[in-house]
């Protein structure tokens, strides 16, 4: 069997920690009763080895082994830099 690693695309909402970032993943979920689509956000803590991400960057992260209590994702690449 091939090993599947999860890859997510999200926006950096915090980069104040050393070698760590917080990435917000937004998704649309259909309300079970009313059928309206609602925006839901998941926050992931990811490892940024070179401290290259800034606030607002669009990044790609992938799942890895647990690196700390809350951090089990690592930065793959920066898709788009934030406009300043």
Swiss-Prot record:
GO terms for biological process: translation. Keywords: Ribonucleoprotein, Ribosomal protein, RNA-binding, rRNA-binding. GO terms for molecular function: rRNA binding; structural constituent of ribosome. The keyword rRNA-binding applies. Belongs to the universal ribosomal protein uS17 family. PANTHER family: 40S RIBOSOMAL PROTEIN S11 FAMILY MEMBER, SMALL RIBOSOMAL SUBUNIT PROTEIN US17M. One of the primary rRNA binding proteins, it binds specifically to the 5'-end of 16S ribosomal RNA. This is Small ribosomal subunit protein uS17.
